[in-house]
Amino acid sequence: MSRQDTKNQGSRFDRAVAIFKKHGGILRTAQALRAGIHPTTLYTMRDSGALDMVSRGVYRLAGKSPLGDPDLVTVATRVPGGVICLISALAFHELTTQIPHEVHVALPRGAEEPRLDHPPIRTYRFTGEAFTQGVETHRIDSVSLRIYSPEKTLADCFKFRNKVGFDTVVEAIRFYRERRSVKVDDLMRYAAICRVKKIIRPYLEALL
């Protein structure tokens, strides 16, 4: 390689690092290419150890602090149209003692099923306001994470009580009362959207 080629490669490398830093140090392959990083530069950075592979097709600048929650970061990056829900959302909001063995993700009906080697995920199909309402965006390890609010998550858990377990639902209500400012109006609004208003009302009256 000539001195000029080496200089050009170094310039492309530095530009790629700057692009990664602009995006919090983590990018999907498609994002990196759209941002102007040449495929050869991307794979050279990977092979030289300048990038760590978080998951297939997800790269992160090497040398950064360990990810606080690599599973959520991977899903947020690989499934940007999804919303973290149910047990995973309860765990994020500290409303359960359950340790999720899969990342629970809501998708709009008709969306393509994600293909991830890791982490394992469980998808749920939500429609209309049941999908769009109650979504919060949090920054985690410099990545935007879409996740349902505590109140929307409780309503979802009542709706999917046969899947998450009713003991988990009751525990979540109790933790919500103890650890959060109770927003009854929001709870009932999301319960109406999820069509569990009649089911949730007596538990709210008893526990809240």
Where are these regions (language model features)?
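Short, Lys/Arg-enriched N-terminal segment that forms or immediately precedes the first helix
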Residues: 1-7
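Nucleic-acid-binding surface
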Residues: 11-31, 35, 41, 46, ...
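Glycine-centered, phosphate/nucleic-acid-interacting loop/turn motifs that mediate DNA/RNA or nucleotide
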Residues: 49
